[in-house]
């Protein structure tokens, strides 16, 4: 009845989605209909209508099916835990250095996060037991505002806060690790990741031509990495003895942390441990994990580059299809995993690393938890249907698809024990009616596993698993019902503007553009898109073009054939001007991510801190650190308390363009062409890479004096640009030895 009610509730919103879901659910749930009949505490006058022989047969059928569906995944999990022991132990015995450690790019999207939380997350990355010169953190703000939190963060990293304007991206060296702080136009997490990917692709284009050992780690801004997280990832993906170097993606073990303990946080902690180390261990044993969470996912960048077009594709033209919205927006991590599973050439290329741990902040309130689980449920159900109806996945991962199908059928019995408990409390049933076999197998096997994991990881809260076993089915039912009742609302919660609607004068595409102008492209009213949704439907499965896409053959000269074959190369689209030198850019940069229709904003290569403060400052001796002069920061904070300090339009990037492209007044003998990294600008629709030549008629940029409270090591990470600048007063710096060029990449 619950399933039929949910399907009927969904039907008015999206007929396409309801039909797909109905077929899948009826096939899944019908298998366990006998289990429901013989297990539910039905009234006596109904039970008398069933012959005793039939009830006995159904009971044995239910017991056998239930045992198989629990024991087989449990045995697979035990096998995985034995062969890949979980724990925060160091897997690599030798000491890694700048040449033996693969380069790792850490992408951290930021949206309205407290500076203290960000600093804690950044410190956990740069303090890892991993060569700092091989770590490059991309701290990407989803929004262009320069507010107090932004200023406090960059001041902590060592970037001056007294500048009149700030470029879009700034490079700084913090604890010997390279950090790029960027601000992009607000468009959501996936849009922020997309813009960051474009920036990474520009910075590392030449490096990727020769190497395939660049990895990208996606984490959330509130995550705290374990000290050996990075090197354990690299051990399983690249450095393990006998490795074939073909691992495409891995996820780790995410646990929760909180400052205030409660029943909700306790249940979340046990659920994280059980879900990470049980379900994903089973999936890894079967060929691939089905979810690469955005909170902790390591990808091989060359593989991610090939999927960028499909993962970052614009969905405005498909917004009327609710199924596509849930699949690609609410469940973007599951959708990315699906793309990788289809693109992989063989099994066991998408795995879980049982030695890579991180902590994330647990949700404190029930309302926030309800909204979070609503997103998870809608993203899960759409991608699950997509996966189980994709023939390519059944051929490549038969055991995985079979196990997922079995686990979906067993979800029907999730509320059985809760209903049985209610029947015992209300005395409508006796203790003799309890299905002891079901309880012994389900609770017993899971508790043995959780007891072992709690002792192994020293998370003794896992020993309270029986509490989760009783309460979690009820909470999961609430999440499901709430997700169904609010399925038509395309918003992530919180204060929003009025939802955009479509009518006879406004198409769904125009409604989405209106929502974008209001600051949230997902805040639209789906119920007004029904007529358009009946006319066409979005393909449920990924394109056939990505099947087996992850294969980069090596060329005879030793170069990797990492071609971006889905679109024309950028260099083929450029027509160089006469007597203008060609920009030194990789022949095949990822034009997929740059030429998409919503990428109207220019992406600028990051500026070094020295270029904001003067080139000659680093030639002066560095005195002892003086007490911090916080007058400038206090003045800026007072301005922030009255409102927004500064903002710029990311579509035009006035400030960034001024900082990147404004040349200085040159002497008659100094006719120096700006470095390509400072004269490069990508956009869609106009000249892709215009060169801005220095003009003696343009004025010199004016900067405020450098504050003495600047922290961090402001060391450059790109080739030095020799341009005369006005000498500014600043903190004297020591003469540093030039680093090896490869270690700076």
From Swiss-Prot:
GO molecular function, one term: chitin synthase activity
Residue ranges, annotated region (Disordered): 613-635, 672-745
GO biological process, one term: cell wall organization
Keywords, in A-Z order: Cell membrane, Cell wall biogenesis/degradation, Glycosyltransferase, Membrane, Transferase, Transmembrane, Transmembrane helix
Annotated catalysed reactions: [(1->4)-N-acetyl-beta-D-glucosaminyl](n) + UDP-N-acetyl-alpha-D-glucosamine = [(1->4)-N-acetyl-beta-D-glucosaminyl](n+1) + UDP + H(+)
Polar residues bias locations: 707-720
Membrane topology: Multi-pass membrane protein
Residue ranges of the TM segments: 26-46, 55-75, 412-432, 434-454, 464-484
Localization: Cell membrane
Family annotation (InterPro entries): Chitin_synth (IPR004835), Nucleotide-diphossugar_trans (IPR029044)
Annotated EC: 2.4.1.16
GO cellular component labels: cell periphery; cell septum; plasma membrane
Similarity-based family: Belongs to the chitin synthase family. Class VI subfamily.
Function: Polymerizes chitin, a structural polymer of the cell wall and septum, by transferring the sugar moiety of UDP-GlcNAc to the non-reducing end of the growing chitin polymer.
This protein's name: Chitin synthase D
Organism: Aspergillus fumigatus (strain ATCC MYA-4609 / CBS 101355 / FGSC A1100 / Af293)
């Amino acid at each position: 009845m619950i399933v039929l009610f949910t399907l009927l509730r969904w039907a008015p919103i999206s007929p396409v989605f309801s039909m797909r879901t109905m077929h899948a659910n009826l096939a899944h749930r019908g298998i366990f209909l006998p289990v429901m009949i013989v297990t539910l505490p039905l009234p006596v006058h109904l039970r008398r209508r069933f012959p005793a022989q039939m009830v006995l047969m159904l009971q044995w059928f239910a017991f056998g099916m239930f045992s198989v569906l629990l024991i087989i995944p449990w045995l697979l999990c035990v096998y995985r835990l034995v062969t890949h022991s979980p724990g925060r132990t160091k897997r690599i015995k030798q000491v890694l250095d700048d040449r033996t450690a693969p380069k790792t790019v850490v992408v951290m999207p930021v949206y309205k996060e407290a500076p203290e939380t960000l600093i804690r997350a950044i410190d956990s990355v740069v303090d890892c037991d991993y060569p700092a010169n091989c770590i490059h953190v991309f701290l990407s703000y989803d929004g262009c505002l320069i507010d107090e939190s932004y200023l406090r963060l960059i001041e902590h990293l060592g970037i001056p806060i007294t500048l009149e304007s700030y470029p879009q991206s700034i490079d700084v060296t913090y604890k010997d690790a390279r950090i790029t702080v960027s601000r992009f136009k607000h468009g959501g997490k996936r849009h922020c990741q997309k813009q960051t990917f474009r920036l990474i692709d520009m910075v590392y284009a030449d490096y990727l031509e020769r190497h395939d050992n660049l990895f990208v780690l996606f984490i959330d801004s509130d995550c705290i990495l374990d000290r050996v997280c990075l090197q354990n990832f690299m051990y399983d993906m690249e450095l393990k003895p006998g490795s074939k170097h073909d691992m495409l993606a891995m996820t780790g073990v995410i646990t929760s942390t909180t400052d205030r303990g409660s029943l909700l946080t306790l249940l979340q902690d046990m659920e994280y441990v059980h879900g990470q180390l049980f379900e994903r261990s089973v999936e890894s044993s079967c060929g691939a994990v089905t979810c690469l969470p955005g909170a902790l996912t390591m990808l091989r960048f060359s593989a991610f580059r090939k999927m960028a077009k499909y993962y970052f594709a614009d969905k405005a033209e498909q917004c009327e299809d609710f199924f596509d919205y849930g699949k690609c927006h609410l469940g973007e991590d599951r959708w990315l995993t699906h793309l990788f599973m289809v693109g992989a050439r063989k099994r066991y290329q998408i795995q879980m690393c049982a030695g890579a741990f991180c902590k994330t902040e647990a949700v404190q309130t029930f309302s926030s938890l309800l909204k979070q689980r609503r997103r998870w449920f809608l993203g899960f159900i759409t991608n699950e249907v997509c996966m189980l109806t994709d023939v390519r996945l059944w051929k490549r991962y038969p055991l995985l698809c079979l196990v997922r199908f079995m686990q979906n059928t067993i979800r029907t019995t999730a509320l059985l024990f809760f209903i049985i408990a209610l029947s015992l409390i209300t005395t409508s049933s006796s203790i003799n009616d309890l299905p002891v076999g079901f309880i012994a197998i389900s609770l017993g096997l899971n508790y043995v596993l959780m007891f072992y994991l709690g002792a192994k990881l020293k998370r003794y809260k896992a020993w309270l698993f029986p509490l989760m076993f009783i309460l979690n089915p009820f909470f999961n039912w609430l999440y499901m019902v709430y997700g169904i009742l609010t399925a038509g609302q395309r918003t992530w919660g919180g204060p929003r503007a009025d939802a955009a609607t479509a009518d006879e004068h406004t198409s769904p595409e125009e409604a989405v553009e209106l929502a974008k102008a209001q600051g949230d492209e997902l805040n639209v009213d789906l119920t007004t898109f029904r007529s358009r949704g009946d006319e066409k439907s979005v393909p449920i499965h990924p394109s056939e073009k990505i099947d087996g896409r992850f294969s980069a053959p090596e060329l005879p000269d030793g170069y990797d054939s990492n071609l971006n074959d889905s679109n024309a190369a950028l260099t083929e689209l450029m027509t160089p001007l006469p007597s203008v030198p060609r920009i030194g850019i990789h022949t095949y940069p990822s034009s997929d991510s740059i030429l998409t229709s919503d990428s109207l904003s220019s992406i600028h290569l990051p500026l070094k801190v020295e270029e904001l403060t003067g080139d000659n400052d680093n030639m002066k001796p560095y005195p002892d650190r003086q007490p911090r002069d916080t007058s400038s920061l206090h003045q800026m904070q007072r301005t922030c308390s009255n409102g927004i300090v500064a903002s710029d339009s990311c579509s035009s990037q006035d400030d960034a363009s001024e900082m990147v492209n404004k040349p200085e007044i040159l002497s008659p003998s100094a006719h120096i062409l700006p470095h390509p990294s400072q004269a490069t600008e990508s956009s869609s629709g106009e000249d892709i890479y215009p060169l801005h030549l220095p003009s003696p008629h343009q004025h010199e940029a004016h900067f405020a004096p450098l504050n003495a409270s600047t922290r961090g090591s402001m060391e450059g990470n790109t080739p030095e640009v020799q341009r005369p600048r006005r000498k500014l007063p600043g903190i004297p710096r020591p003469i540093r030895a030039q680093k090896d060029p490869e270690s700076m990449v």
